[in-house]
Amino acid sequence: MRIIKGIVAAPRRILLYGQHGVGKSSWAAKAPNPIFINVEDGLCDLECDKTPVLRSITEVYEALIWLGGEEDHGYKTIVIDTLDWMERLIHQAEVELINDRKIKTLADVGFGKGYPRAIPHWDVTLKYLDHLRRVKGMTVVLLAHAKVERFESPEADSYDRYSIDLHKTASGMLQEWCDEVLFAAFRVNTRTEEAGFGKERKLAVGGKDRYIRTSESASCIAKNRLGLPSELPMDWDAYAAYVRKPSVKEQVQVGARPASGNIEGLVVNGSSKSNGSSVGVVEIETPF
């Protein structure tokens, strides 16, 4: 057995989630030579390379297979924008497979058997992303929106905090897989003013300064494996300064091959507006 000693530098697996309009996509666009898997349809005004808007989970898989194929496409970072919109495609595909007019969402499936149907999709997605990272040397950036949910602490009273806007099983899988789970937010302070009749009220002030939380706190879910400071500026370079640069490129040899079918015109360059065309639905087989 080959023994690996010390630190091994490898492409990062990053999940960045945050409030609407905080600049998640703009942050990811500063990563090395990124290609966006365009699921949410919010990239028209962002200068980046992107796929057309992908309307089914099959199209997402096909895009991932194309990136992992034998062609040297030159992209260094894959960005999925966003995970919560991708989850909708997964749930939509499973509802269609059930083929029951009474079932509109996976929540409608009885005995708690609905949402577990999505787990194999996330397993396949992580295998595709592992392939891109290990064989193609691509950094993986996963973007998602935030939600406020109740956290039942075993050590204190329950309280609200920000979490990833995904079903809890999918959220747990992705958090475990990623090296960094980062929370992006606007910095808001409060001030107190007189409200009359001897009462006071608090007002929110600020809201323009943006920052990234890198470690768990009472307000949000977060983690990192780089020893990052608890907060970073909302800037890719501020994060990248802590990433170890690989000295030796190691590859795991797997049987990679491109997807079947016509995939010409998959990538939309620059800030050109997507016409929403799809890349076609094909039978998907894993490339490894």
Describe the residue ranges of each PLM region:
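Conserved nucleotide-binding/hydrolysis micro-motifs of P-loop NTPases
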Residues: 40-44, 83-85, 146-150, 187-190, ...
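Conserved P-loop
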Residues: 2-94
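P-loop NTPase motor core
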Residues: 85-170
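Conserved GTP-binding G-domain of TRAFAC-class P-loop NTPases and closely related GTPase folds
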Residues: 152-268, 282
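Hydrophobic/aromatic ligand-binding patch that stacks against planar heteroaromatic rings
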Residues: 26-28, 132, 173-174
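Short, well-ordered beta-strand core segments
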Residues: 34-36, 140, 181-183
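Long, low-complexity, intrinsically disordered segments
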Residues: 266-288
